[in-house]
């Protein structure tokens, strides 16, 4: 399904990653950052997060995002809610299939 919605000004997406501008600086891995880079997930990323979360969907998402962002889970728990919601939006936009890959083989 094609999504024609305009991206928010705080979000940049390409085929491999999303760059998320935070509403305020946050400390991740001991470094103060004003944006985070989320790489596109693999099937392995999703399966690993699902296995280690033990059925807890919120924990599964935190583990998955921590892996994709290469930050600690505790760092994500310290984000302001608005910034965590930006991560959620970025994730769903990143995995969305818009059918637009021109190099796909038939």
Locations of the language-model features?
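Short, surface-exposed, charged amphipathic helix/loop patches that serve as local interaction elements
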Residues: 2-106
């Amino acid at each position: 399904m094609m999504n024609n919605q305009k991206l928010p000004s705080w979000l940049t997406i390409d085929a491999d990653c999303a760059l998320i501008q935070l509403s305020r600086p946050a400390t991740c891995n001991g470094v103060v950052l004003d944006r985070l880079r989320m790489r596109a997930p693999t099937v392995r990323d999703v399966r690993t997060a699902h296995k280690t979360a033990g059925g807890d969907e919120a924990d599964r998402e935190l583990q998955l995002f921590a892996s994709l962002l290469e930050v600690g889970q505790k760092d994500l728990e310290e984000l302001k809610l608005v910034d965590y919601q930006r991560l959620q939006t970025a994730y769903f936009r990143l995995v969305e299939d818009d059918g637009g890959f021109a190099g796909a083989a038939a």
